[in-house]
Amino acid sequence: MLETYHFMKKYYYLLITIFLLASCEEDIKFNTPAFQSLKDNVFWRAQNYSAQAKAGGGVYISGGLGTNVVTLKLPSLETKTYVLGVDNLTAASYSDRFAIDKPEFTTGTNKGSGQVVITEFDNNKGTISGTFKFTAVNTNAEDLENPSVTFTEGVFYKIPYTPLVNFNN
C-alpha cells in the first residue's frame, strides 16, 4: 500500500508539472503603430494617432486618448532633433477637448521646453517614427492648480503619414 502511494505521488507531481508547463503561453502583443509617453509620470498611450502634412510645409503628429490630445508641430519631416520652446514653428501641445474649463498646455516662443526627434520617415510606407519629451505651459495663467504638464519618454512609432492633397491638376 505504501509503494502504491509513492508511485501515485510521483505521477501526481508529474501531471501537475506537465499541466503547468502546458498552460504557460506567450501572448506577445505588438504595439505598431504606437504613440505613448509618461504624462506627469503616469503611463499614457494614445488610442488614435495620425501624422498630417501642414499647408505651409512640415507636419502635425497627433495622438489622442479619449478627449485628451497631444500634438507635435514640426516645420519639416527631416530626421533630426527639433528643440521646443524656441519659436512657434516647432511646438507641442496637450489639451482636453471636452473639459468644462478646456485646459490647454503649449510650448512656443520662450514658453515651455523639450524636444522632438524624428528618427525615421519612410516615404514609401507612409510612416513616421521618433521620440519626444516636453513641458508645456497652461495657456490660462489664472489656473494656478495646473501651471504645466510634462510628457517624458515619449515615443511615436510607425504613425501613418498623410501627405498634403493637391486638388489642382
What do these predicted ranges mean?
Residues L20-S23:
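C-terminal motif of bacterial Sec signal peptides marking the signal peptidase cleavage site
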Residues F35-K39, F43-Q47, Q52-T127, V137-T139:
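Surface-exposed helix/loop patches within compact recognition domains
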Residues E25-D27:
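Bacterial signal peptide processing site
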Residues T32:
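Acidic, metal-coordinating catalytic segment for phosphate/diphosphate chemistry
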Residues M1-F7:
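Short, Lys/Arg-enriched N-terminal segments with co-localized hydrophobic residues
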Residues K9-L14:
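Sec-dependent signal peptide recognition
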Residues F121-N169:
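C-terminal or internal capping secondary-structure element at the end of a domain, subdomain, or sheet
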